[in-house]
């Protein structure tokens, strides 16, 4: 993939960009096999990859520069701003949005936040696109509510210029730290969630809920989990760290009992809406800590699916799952190193299947799906 930003030395986020896609994929497979070398694997699935450019459905842009000439992109460690509006990882539809946002920032008087001076209002722009209909969600991350009414007043013009904008919010992040968002979300449009669909499963993207950034590969990941689970005798499953319910909703059947647990209330609201749209009556989503939920249960499900953050599922949940001993565990991970460590804590299980999903081209990162069966 060619990238003018990389060639000019302005961005090094895609550290593997000079390697051909096949070479990147082979290196990731080697890394995964090395991490699981001490754990016998029954079946290695063929790695899954997607487009090498224009695959991201989300842009997280630091806003810098001046109110008259804002820059949207990132800051180097020395504070030097870099405009990333022409990043080839974004879909072509984003370019028109970025072009419209720069003069809008000036019209609305949203002074970019200056980290060194601790002054200004607009910290980030967070843009997400649905592959279902091209609809967009735009979040303005502000230091305070000082410019909120100016933003409201100017917004109708932006919505008229960009009719694909379906959800717009202001997020208040008052802390002088590199934190992407604060706790308070203020909706500026009537619509509060972006409609999405993978493999015929309706999903909803809300402002403060995690959603995969590579829709093509994420769709394949969910479909694979569905195929694995539905081939097993599963009547009751848990989906821990469930997010908006992508895994559980793909796996669930009308007869199956599914319990989905996620700490973020916004994500649970999305999951419940999807379950209702699918007509699933034996599905229960709750906004709880996954470890606290699991360790407080007595009944043992047939299968537990976990999709934890990069740090893994943690010692307490590892020990509890080992003690509880469900017949099957499906582990989806964006950090194979912590996954391998967690699986090493389950001596009573064997790895039946493993498959790599190249969710993050041009980097060393990848997603991996593993099926474990109790011995």
UniProtKB/Swiss-Prot annotation:
Record's keyword annotation contains Methyltransferase: yes
The protein's Enzyme Commission number: 2.1.1.189
GO molecular function, one term: rRNA (uridine-C5-)-methyltransferase activity
Residues holding [4Fe-4S] cluster: 3, 11, 14, 87
Binding site for S-adenosyl-L-methionine: 212, 241, 262, 307
Pfam families for the chain: tRNA_U5-meth_tr (PF05958)
ATP-binding is among the record's keywords: no
InterPro entries: 23SrRNA_MeTrfase_RlmC, MeTrfase_TrmA_AS, MeTrfase_TrmA_CS, SAM-dependent_MTases_sf, U5_MeTrfase_fam
Keywords tagged on the record: 4Fe-4S, Iron, Iron-sulfur, Metal-binding, Methyltransferase, rRNA processing, S-adenosyl-L-methionine, Transferase
Catalytic activity: uridine(747) in 23S rRNA + S-adenosyl-L-methionine = 5-methyluridine(747) in 23S rRNA + S-adenosyl-L-homocysteine + H(+)
Active site (catalytic residues): 334 (nucleophile)
GO terms, biological process: rRNA base methylation
Similarity annotation: Belongs to the class I-like SAM-binding methyltransferase superfamily. RNA M5U methyltransferase family. RlmC subfamily.
PANTHER family: RNA M5U METHYLTRANSFERASE (PTHR11061), TRNA (URACIL(54)-C(5))-METHYLTRANSFERASE (PTHR11061:SF30)
Function: Catalyzes the formation of 5-methyl-uridine at position 747 (m5U747) in 23S rRNA.
Protein name: 23S rRNA (uracil(747)-C(5))-methyltransferase RlmC
Species of the source: Cronobacter sakazakii (strain ATCC BAA-894)
Gene: rlmC
């Amino acid at each position: 993939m060619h990238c003018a930003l990389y060639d000019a030395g302005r961005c090094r986020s895609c550290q593997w960009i000079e390697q051909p896609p096949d070479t990147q994929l082979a290196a990731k497979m080697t890394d995964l096999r090395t991490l699981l070398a001490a754990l016998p694997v029954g079946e290695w699935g063929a790695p899954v990859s997607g487009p090498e450019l224009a695959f991201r459905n989300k842009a997280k842009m630091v806003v810098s520069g001046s109110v008259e000439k804002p820059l949207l992109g990132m800051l180097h460690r020395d504070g030097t701003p870099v405009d990333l509006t022409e990043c080839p990882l974004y879909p072509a539809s984003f370019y028109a949005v970025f072009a419209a946002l720069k003069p809008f920032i000036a019209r609305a008087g949203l002074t970019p936040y200056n980290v060194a001076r601790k002054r200004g209002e607009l910290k980030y722009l967070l843009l997400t696109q649905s592959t279902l209909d091209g609809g967009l969600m735009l979040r303005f991350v502000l230091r305070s509510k000082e410019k909120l009414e100016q933003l409201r007043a100017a917004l109708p013009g932006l919505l008229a210029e960009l009719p694909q904008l379906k959800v717009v919010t202001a997020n208040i992040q008052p802390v002088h730290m590199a934190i992407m968002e604060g706790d308070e979300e203020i909706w500026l449009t009537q619509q509060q969630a972006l409609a999405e669909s993978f493999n015929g499963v309706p999903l909803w993207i809300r402002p403060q809920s995690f959603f995969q950034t590579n829709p093509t590969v994420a769709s394949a990941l969910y479909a694979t989990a569905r195929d694995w689970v539905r081939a097993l005798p599963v009547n009751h499953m848990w989906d821990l760290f469930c997010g908006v319910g992508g895994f559980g909703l793909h796996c669930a059947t009308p007869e199956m009992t599914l319990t989905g647990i996620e700490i973020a209330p916004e994500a649970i609201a999305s999951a419940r809406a999807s379950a209702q749209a699918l007509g699933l009556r034996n599905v229960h989503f709750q906004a709880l800590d996954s470890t606290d939920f699991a360790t407080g249960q007595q009944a043992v499900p047939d299968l537990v699916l976990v999709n934890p953050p990069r740090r893994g599922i943690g010692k307490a949940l590892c020990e509890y799952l080992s003690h509880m001993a469900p017949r099957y565990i499906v582990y989806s991970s964006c950090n194979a190193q912590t996954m391998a460590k967690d699986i090493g804590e389950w001596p009573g299980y064997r790895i039946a299947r493993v498959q790599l999903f190249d969710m993050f081209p041009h980097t060393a990162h990848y997603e991996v799906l593993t099926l474990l069966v109790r011995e």
